[in-house]
């Protein structure tokens, strides 16, 4: 059976055996399941969750995310929204019998999330909504952990605990290096920073990562998910929770999910650029308001700016001294070079700069190799410093761009490995 209404082509009936979809405007819906959802319960087992998987040209990985979700949820509780995909993303999803909504114009991730929530009235039919990236797979204990945290009525959002997917056989040397670097970064950030930020007496976490996190429906109804002008959605959604005092952000290691990191330096550059630009754009949008959240955020911003400046300055000084040391008379003959070289090396010889930049960072890598039981990190860690410098450069470069550029949130998919 088919039903037409303005802007929507609807194929009723769950599963791959539904009618062929029709195009009636901006939205194409392929399969629709039951819209049943219980009221908010006190026991974790009573809490109903919907799963949203926004996707744009994700045919390489969408099957893995759906399979992971189907192992933990009924098929009628899973909703894929294909945001103007030019590949077979929507067809692959529809064959699994889950709900699929296909957007005919690229709205971006935030717009896709907003569209599927509205189309299926998810915040009216479920107690919470899990937003899952198409390249992410859930740990078997994820749902139980999320429900346990949502059982606390003060919790507005449950932050996923990110673990870098480690499949070295599918990656080049550069891809393995990026994955190892990200694994170290996520481990340190979550255990040394974010657990403290999400403690119930602090509640100052500035990011609920959009790769695999749950929002309470009552909080989602109050949020402006897609305000426009932002390149990504997850910083804004987290700021909305704090700015509108919708509740606290919770995080625990029992909500693990495995995320696929970029395979190339080009995709890494694009991803970090988007994340960093999105962070500064969100600060521009929400501005400052009196709160412990902003007090903690101010300290974090100060740390990011100062550390990035120091890292880049030390790297430039190291390059300057190295050229003077090994470049010979040709370099020293340049105007003012010898005077500058003498002044810098009087306080910072090349050995001190090299040790300061490399040794502390590599010690962290050695510890991570022991914790993870992955000796290969000792090799990849030799090349982490250039990635750290790239992160520092992008953190500073995106500050002025956040105030001078406007983004529409549209996305393009990076290189993926088939799930």
Feature roles, as predicted:
Residues 90-119, 161:
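Conserved donor nucleotide-binding strand/loop of the catalytic core
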Residues 110-112, 124, 140-228, 273, ...:
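Long helical/loop segments within the catalytic core of UDP-sugar-dependent glycosyltransferases
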Residues 67-76:
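Short, acidic, metal-binding catalytic loop of nucleotide-sugar glycosyltransferases
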């Amino acid at each position: 059976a088919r039903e037409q209404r303005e802007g929507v082509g609807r194929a009723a009936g769950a599963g791959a055996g539904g009618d062929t979809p029709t195009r009636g405007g901006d939205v194409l819906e392929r399969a629709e399941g039951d819209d049943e959802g219980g009221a908010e319960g006190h026991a974790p087992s009573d809490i109903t969750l919907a799963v949203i998987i926004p996707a744009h040209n994700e045919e390489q990985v969408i099957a893995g995310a759906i399979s992971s979700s189907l192992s933990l949820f009924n098929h009628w509780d899973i909703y894929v929204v294909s945001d103007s995909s030019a590949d077979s993303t929507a067809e692959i999803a529809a064959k699994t019998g889950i709900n699929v909504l296909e957007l005919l114009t690229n709205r971006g991730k935030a717009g896709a999330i907003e569209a599927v929530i509205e189309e299926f009235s998810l915040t009216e039919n479920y107690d919470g909504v899990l937003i899952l990236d198409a390249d992410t797979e859930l740990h078997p204990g994820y749902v139980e952990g999320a429900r346990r945290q949502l059982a606390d009525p003060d919790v507005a959002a449950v932050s996923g605990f990110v673990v870098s997917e480690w499949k070295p056989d599918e990656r080049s040397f550069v891809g393995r290096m990026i994955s190892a670097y990200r694994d170290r970064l996520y481990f340190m950030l979550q255990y040394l920073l974010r657990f403290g930020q999400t403690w119930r007496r602090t509640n100052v976490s500035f990011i609920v990562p959009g790769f695999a996190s749950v929002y309470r429906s009552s909080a989602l109804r109050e949020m402006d998910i897609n305000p426009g002008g932002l390149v990504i959605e997850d910083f804004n959604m987290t700021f909305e929770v704090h700015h509108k005092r919708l509740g606290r952000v919770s995080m625990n290691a029992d909500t693990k999910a495995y995320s696929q990191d970029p395979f190339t330096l080009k995709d890494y550059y694009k991803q970090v650029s988007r994340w960093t630009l999105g962070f500064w754009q969100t600060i521009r949008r929400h501005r400052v308001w009196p709160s412990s959240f902003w007090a903690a955020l101010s300290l974090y911003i100060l740390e990011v700016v100062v550390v990035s400046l120091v890292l880049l300055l030390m790297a430039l000084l190291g390059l300057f001294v190295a050229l003077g040391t090994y470049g010979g008379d040709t370099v020293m003959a340049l105007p003012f070079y010898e005077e500058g070289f003498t002044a810098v090396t009087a306080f910072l010889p090349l050995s001190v700069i090299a040790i300061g930049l490399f040794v502390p960072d590599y010690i962290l890598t050695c510890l991570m190799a022991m914790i993870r039981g992955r000796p290969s990190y000792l090799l990849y860690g030799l090349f982490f410093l250039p990635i750290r410098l790239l992160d520092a450069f992008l953190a500073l470069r995106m500050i002025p761009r956040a105030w001078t550029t406007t983004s529409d949130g549209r996305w393009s998919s990076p290189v993926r490995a088939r799930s």
